[in-house]
Each structure stands twice: as structure tokens, then as C-alpha cells.
């Protein structure tokens, strides 16, 4: 017998786990619109207070993937997603979006899953639009862009139409719920490798283990001690690395990669226009902390994608493709190709 919403709520109140298979059935009910908004809000609150388990998160992510519009990719070698949970409140420029262009120029295939801004000044979708790209591409168009440019951006609302069911509840609640940590786990292209930033240190080990449960090959889950959901320049970064079926947790520092420490306030922007300007400065090889943090995160992406032998090797490769202009050229190629796809449609 599948668990009822009332039974699920009772479990969370008693701080007991909803088991993986039960969570799968419960989430299917939610995604089909069979659970009332009041009950959805109550269960989400209960899970948040209790703290979601690996099995609960993996079960919910499985269903979100099931209900998503998939992107079919034939060649997954060196494929990676660079994504964050958001919600770190740092208001920095779009580091992961900038790192996407650098990693693609460095030899990775970047299937990036993202959305508009929720808590920051500029989300990945906002940044790409500011650059002139068309973001609302259909799954087959994303696959085409990935094949031709090494970049495929999957705009979450296009690929997760069932999420409309819970959108009003999430908006009215106005607090983080399990859905904030599900987004980065539900890449519609099924990227086998992922660099994921998280908003809380507890999630470093949890998300790495969830990714293992979901069949990921390699992952780096990161949280900066200054609160950033990226590899940080302002403090050490906690890392949960999934490789060869094992999760290892450790800490890295910018100095490990020959990078000077710098406070995150040096990376702050007020809006998408400022974020675009800082992103293009990095890709024009203007020295400074913005370039350093992009090189660090793109380097980590190249490592987890299997292009680089280590994060340090990845950082060197990232700096090289920024310096020779190929990362900047990748922006122009991607923007032009998405516009071409939109015209053809």
C-alpha cells in the first residue's frame, strides 16, 4: 500500500523517515496534483524541520526526473553540469555560468540546468539572456546546441512542467524546502558528472551520497566556509567527492591552487547588467578575483568531467582557454547558435 499524505505528515512530525519507495509514491501523487496545497505545505515543513534523509531526497529526485522532459544525448563522455542550490545570499556575479563557457572551451560538454533568479541578483537564465542567448529551448534544441557548441542550457520551467503544481505553495511558503535541493539533482540531460554548490555544510556529504544513489559517475559537492555555494576564494571550501562509487569528504583552500584569497564582496553585483559586465571582463582575461574564482570553479568542472587529472590541472587549463580567447569565443558561438535555433523554430 502506498503511503498516504496524512501518514507521511505523521512520520515527519514524529521525526521518522519516509522510506525511499514510499517517497517515490508520495511524490508521484504530489506531481499529479492529487495532494492538497495545505497538505503539501505541511509535509514540506515537516521534512524541513525533521531534516531530509538521503533516501527521501533520492526518492523525490527520481520522481522529478520521471516527470521531466528529457534531453537525449548520445555521447556523454566528458559531460558535466555546473549548478548550485542558490540561496547563499552572496549576490555575486554568475560564477557558474561564466565557468560553463570556460569548461566548454577546455573540452567538457556542459549540460547546465538552471532558472531565473530566486535569491540572487541574477540567475543563470538572467545572465544568459543578458548576453543575448535564447534560453527557452525545447529538449531537441538543447541537444543540438550541446552537440554543436559544447553547451546546452536547460531552462527549468521548460523541462519540469509538473513543477507548476507546487509553485504556488512554494511561493507562499517563502522558505527553503526539499525542492531547493532537488533542482540540481534533476538534470534533464542526465549528466553523469556534476559540480554542485550547496547552501549548507550538512548537504556536502548528503548530496554526494544522493548523487551516488541516483547513478552519477563523478561529483564534487562544495560549500565555502564563507557561505558561498561555489569553491570560494574567501575561505576554505568543504568538498564531497564521488568517484569510483565512494564518497570522500575533504577541504580545499585557494592557496592550494596558487590563488590569492579574496573576500566575496569583491564579486558582488547589483543586477544582471553588472553580472554580464563582470562575466565578460573575466572572459576578456582581466586579472582579479573574478577571473580567479572562475578559473577555480571551471577547473573543478574540468576535473569532475574527466578532462583534467586534478583540480589544479583543471585550473591551469581554464586559465589557458581564457587567455587565448577561446572561452570568450564560446560565448559568441553559443549565443549565435541559440538565436539560429529560435529562428528555425
Swiss-Prot record:
Pathway it belongs to? Answer: Amino-acid biosynthesis; L-tryptophan biosynthesis; L-tryptophan from chorismate: step 2/5
**Necessary cofactors:** Mg(2+)
The EC designation for this entry is 2.4.2.18
Amino-acid positions noted as binding anthranilate 1 in the UniProt annotation, renumbered to this chain: 84, 115
For the ligand (Mg(2+) 2), the binding residues are 229-230
UniProt binding sites for 5-phospho-alpha-D-ribose 1-diphosphate: 84, 87-88, 92, 94-97, 112-120, 124
Q: So where does Mg(2+) 1 get bound?
A: 96, 230
Explain how, and how many, cofactor molecules are bound.
Binds 2 magnesium ions per monomer.
Keywords, in A-Z order: Amino-acid biosynthesis, Aromatic amino acid biosynthesis, Glycosyltransferase, Magnesium, Metal-binding, Transferase, Tryptophan biosynthesis
Assembly information from the UniProt record: Homodimer.
Q: Which HAMAP family match?
A: TrpD (MF_00211)
Name assigned to this protein? Anthranilate phosphoribosyltransferase
Originating species? Xanthomonas euvesicatoria pv. vesicatoria (strain 85-10) (Xanthomonas campestris pv. vesicatoria)
Tell me the lineage of the source organism. Bacteria, Pseudomonadati, Pseudomonadota, Gammaproteobacteria, Lysobacterales
Q: What is this protein's gene name?
A: trpD
Amino acid at each position: 500500500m502506498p503511503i498516504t499524505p496524512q501518514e507521511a505528515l505523521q512520520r515527519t512530525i514524529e521525526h521518522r523517515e519516509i522510506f525511499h519507495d514510499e517517497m517515490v509514491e508520495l511524490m508521484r501523487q504530489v506531481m499529479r496534483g492529487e495532494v492538497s496545497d495545505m497538505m503539501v505545505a505541511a509535509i514540506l515543513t515537516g521534512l524541513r524541520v525533521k531534516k531530509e534523509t538521503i533516501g527521501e531526497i533520492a526518492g523525490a529526485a527520481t520522481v522529478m526526473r520521471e516527470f521531466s522532459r528529457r534531453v537525449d544525448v548520445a555521447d556523454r563522455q566528458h559531460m558535466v553540469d555546473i549548478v548550485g542550490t542558490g540561496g547563499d545570499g552572496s549576490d555575486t556575479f554568475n560564477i557558474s555560468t561564466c565557468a560553463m563557457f570556460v569548461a566548454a572551451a577546455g573540452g567538457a560538454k556542459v549540460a547546465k540546468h538552471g532558472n531565473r533568479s530566486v535569491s540572487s541578483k541574477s540567475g543563470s537564465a538572467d545572465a544568459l539572456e543578458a548576453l543575448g542567448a535564447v534560453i527557452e529551448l525545447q529538449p531537441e534544441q538543447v541537444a543540438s546546441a550541446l552537440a554543436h557548441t559544447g553547451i546546452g542550457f536547460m531552462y527549468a520551467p521548460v523541462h519540469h512542467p509538473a513543477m507548476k503544481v507546487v509553485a504556488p505553495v512554494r511561493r507562499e511558503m517563502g522558505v527553503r524546502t526539499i525542492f531547493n535541493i532537488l533542482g540540481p539533482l534533476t538534470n534533464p540531460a542526465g549528466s553523469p558528472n556534476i559540480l554542485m554548490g550547496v547552501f549548507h555544510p550538512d548537504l556536502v556529504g548528503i548530496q554526494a551520497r544522493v548523487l551516488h544513489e541516483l547513478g552519477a559517475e563523478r561529483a564534487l559537492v562544495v560549500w565555502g566556509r564563507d557561505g558561498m555555494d561555489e569553491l570560494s576564494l574567501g575561505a576554505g571550501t568543504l568538498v564531497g567527492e564521488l568517484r569510483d562509487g565512494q564518497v570522500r569528504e575533504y577541504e580545499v583552500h585557494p592557496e592550494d591552487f596558487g590563488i590569492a584569497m579574496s573576500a566575496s564582496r569583491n564579486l558582488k553585483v547589483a543586477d544582471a547588467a553588472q553580472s554580464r559586465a563582470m562575466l565578460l571582463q573575466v572572459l576578456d582575461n582581466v586579472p582579479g578575483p573574478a577571473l580567479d574564482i572562475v578559473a577555480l570553479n571551471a577547473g573543478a568542472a574540468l576535473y569532475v568531467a574527466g578532462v583534467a587529472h586534478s583540480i589544479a590541472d583543471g585550473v591551469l587549463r581554464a586559465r589557458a582557454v581564457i587567455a587565448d580567447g577561446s572561452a570568450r569565443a564560446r560565448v559568441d558561438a553559443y549565443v549565435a547558435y541559440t538565436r539560429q535555433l529560435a529562428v528555425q523554430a
